């Protein structure tokens, strides 16, 4: 006959109704047995309990670390946003009248100008992708002009919407616009780029285009005066 699973059972255990504990658990140091007040017997594997507690502490530690890191990043982000807002208030939005009365209107018009520039410089609006743009269309054929090709090239498509939007801002909120340009030149763009772009602007616009326009304006004014003088002389001779 095989060995009894519960070993030797005392009569007083049976009489008291105490739980029966398997024999291999009684003297096993890896398993802790506890009897609850209601008589139930609880067996606790010590090694497993220690491992679970270790994992639990590690999970709690990682959770607290992640939460602390998230709060740190949130605080840093809030500080960064507040720093940016303060920078814009101190360096760009310094004209309170423009900010309070014109900035919203200027933004709406600038957005409209940006979309207008996008539409004007789109190839689809100049016949490049028209179904009639083929040799089989006959008299209905749409051939893009040189002006449309100039207006729809890649540099123009990339810059025209922004140029129009910037023009709106420069006309409706000139102080804010100039402050924004100064801040970009001072704190965003490299110094070499700013110097080169300023020199290029002076050569092309100030010393080139504006001088030619002034010369053309002066020539037109002189020619207009000469023409008026000639007309007056002609009228005076005819009257005599």
UniProtKB/Swiss-Prot annotation:
Transmembrane segments: 101-120, 150-169
Topology versus the membrane: Multi-pass membrane protein
Stretches in topological domain Mitochondrial matrix: 121-149
Entry GO CC: mitochondrial inner membrane
Keyword Transmembrane helix attributed: yes
Record text on subunit structure and interactions: Component of the mitochondrial contact site and cristae organizing system (MICOS) complex.
Its job: Component of the MICOS complex, a large protein complex of the mitochondrial inner membrane that plays crucial roles in the maintenance of crista junctions, inner membrane architecture, and formation of contact sites to the outer membrane.
Protein name from the UniProt record: MICOS complex subunit MIC27
Gene of this entry: MIC27
């Amino acid at each position: 006959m095989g060995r009894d699973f519960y070993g030797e059972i005392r009569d007083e255990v049976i009489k008291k109704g105490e739980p029966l504990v398997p024999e291999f658990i009684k003297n096993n140091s890896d398993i802790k047995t506890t009897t609850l007040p209601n008589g139930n017997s609880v067996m606790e594997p010590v090694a497993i309990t220690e491992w679970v507690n270790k994992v639990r502490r590690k999970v709690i530690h990682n959770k607290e670390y992640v939460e602390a890191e998230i709060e740190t990043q949130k605080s840093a982000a809030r500080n960064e946003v507040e720093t940016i807002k303060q920078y814009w208030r101190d360096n760009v939005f310094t004209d309170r009248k423009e900010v309070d009365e014109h900035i919203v209107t200027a933004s709406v018009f600038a957005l409209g100008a940006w979309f207008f520039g996008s539409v004007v410089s789109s190839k689809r609006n100049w016949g490049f992708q028209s179904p009639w743009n083929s040799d089989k269309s006959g008299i209905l054929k749409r051939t893009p002009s040189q002006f449309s090709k100039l207006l729809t090239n890649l540099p123009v498509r990339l810059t025209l919407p922004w140029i129009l939007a910037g023009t709106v801002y420069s006309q409706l909120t000139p102080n804010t616009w100039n402050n924004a340009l100064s801040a970009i030149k001072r704190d965003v763009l490299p110094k070499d780029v700013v110097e080169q772009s300023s020199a290029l602007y002076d050569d092309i616009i100030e010393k080139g285009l504006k001088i030619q326009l002034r010369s053309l304006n002066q020539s037109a004014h002189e020619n207009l005066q000469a023409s008026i003088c000639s007309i007056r002389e002609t009228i005076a001779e005819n009257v005599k």
